[in-house]
Amino acid sequence: MPFERYEILLPLKYNDDTAVEPEKFQATRRELVGQFGALTMDAPPVSGLWVSSGHEYQDELIRFVVDAEATPATDEFWRDFKERLKERFRQVEIWIVAYPIRLL
């Protein structure tokens, strides 16, 4: 079965510039480890920049990385999980990317 790497970018602050509560990251981590058995986190934040309605926004983000078998059930999990993350982190969009990987 082929594997994919999933990268999730989660904001450290809400859109009103208040800090996201640590419990929300902990809950996300628990869910992913419970579902897939492992998780990697890039602890130093990455910076992001985006434009909406002519206004420029900057984000500080944490990256969660999960490697998992590419199955229809995995795809369904990510679609549902993304919607929960959008609510949890009060975001219009949460960026989750997937790409094939080969384990050696």
Name each region found by the language model.
Residues 1-104:
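Positively charged, small/polar-rich N-terminal and surface patches that mediate targeting and assembly
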